[in-house]
From Swiss-Prot:
Chief localization: membrane
Topology term for the membrane: Multi-pass membrane protein
Lineage, highest ranks first: Bacteria, Pseudomonadati, Aquificota, Aquificia, Aquificales
Swiss-Prot/TrEMBL keywords: Cell membrane, Membrane, Transmembrane, Transmembrane helix
Cysteine disulfide partners in this protein: none
Intracellular or extracellular location(s): Cell membrane
An annotated GO cellular component: plasma membrane
Protein name: Uncharacterized protein aq_2036
TM annotation in the entry: 5-27, 98-120, 125-147, 185-207
Taxonomic source organism: Aquifex aeolicus (strain VF5)
Length: 216
């Protein structure tokens, strides 16, 4: 039973590290940082950065709160036109539904993982969790960044209705969240998740050495 619990804890750790990293990325600070970068693409139809940034933050609020979604639906461009089409609103509602399951599941599994580690009192779980996390991320990273647009499309087709998330370049969602935004966001999540794994790995190694030294 102890080995089975250890195996389960090791297997769920990458889900936890990726989920927590994604939650950190889903923040206004990340959006502000991304928009402040010199190589962030300008809007080809001339929308000012301030307006794009405001709408991008509103999109974030929309997928994490009911109030934000209501504001998102009512949003207007500076010219008075409706900012988002019904199709764009529908997709963001789909994203909100997905995140309402995904993030809570990450929190629950995080608690289970921490409780399991304390229950087993084994630094080996930390070590193997870190190793498995690093190897899996390396594998997924190679697959993802070899052809990012294809990986992006595959992910969306699996998680959402394949016909619900594709938009025209002139649609506001594409203008405020260009592919560069998602590429950088994915890279940020991957790196942060990798660092989480390394931290857990070295915590396990140092803890094991400490116990050995104490026993000696």
């Amino acid at each position: 039973m102890r080995k089975l619990i250890s195996l389960i804890l090791v297997i769920i750790f990458p889900y936890i590290s990726l989920g927590l990293s994604a939650r950190i990325a889903f923040s206004e600070k990340f959006i502000e940082w991304e928009y402040s970068r010199k190589n962030f693409p300008e809007d080809r139809w001339g929308m000012e950065k301030e307006e794009r940034l405001k709408l991008a933050k509103l999109g974030l609020k929309a997928v994490i709160s009911d109030k934000g979604m209501e504001e998102f639906k009512k949003a207007r461009l500076k010219n008075g036109k409706r900012a988002f089409t019904d199709r764009e609103v529908k997709h963001m509602e789909d994203v909100k539904r997905f995140l309402s399951f995904f993030f809570p599941s990450v929190y629950v599994l995080s608690i289970i993982w921490i409780a399991g580690v304390f229950l087993l009192r084994s630094f080996d779980v930390l070590i193997w969790s870190g190793i498995f996390n690093s190897l899996l991320l390396l594998f997924l990273g190679i697959l993802t960044f070899t052809n990012y647009e294809k990986a992006f499309e595959l992910f969306h087709n699996v998680v959402f209705d394949p016909y619900s998330w594709k938009f025209r370049y002139s649609d506001t969602l594409i203008r405020i969240y260009p592919m560069k935004f998602w590429y950088d966001g994915t890279l940020f999540v991957a790196i942060l998740s990798f660092l989480f794994g390394i931290l857990v790995l070295f915590t396990g190694i140092l803890g094991k050495k400490f116990l050995k030294g104490k026993g000696a």
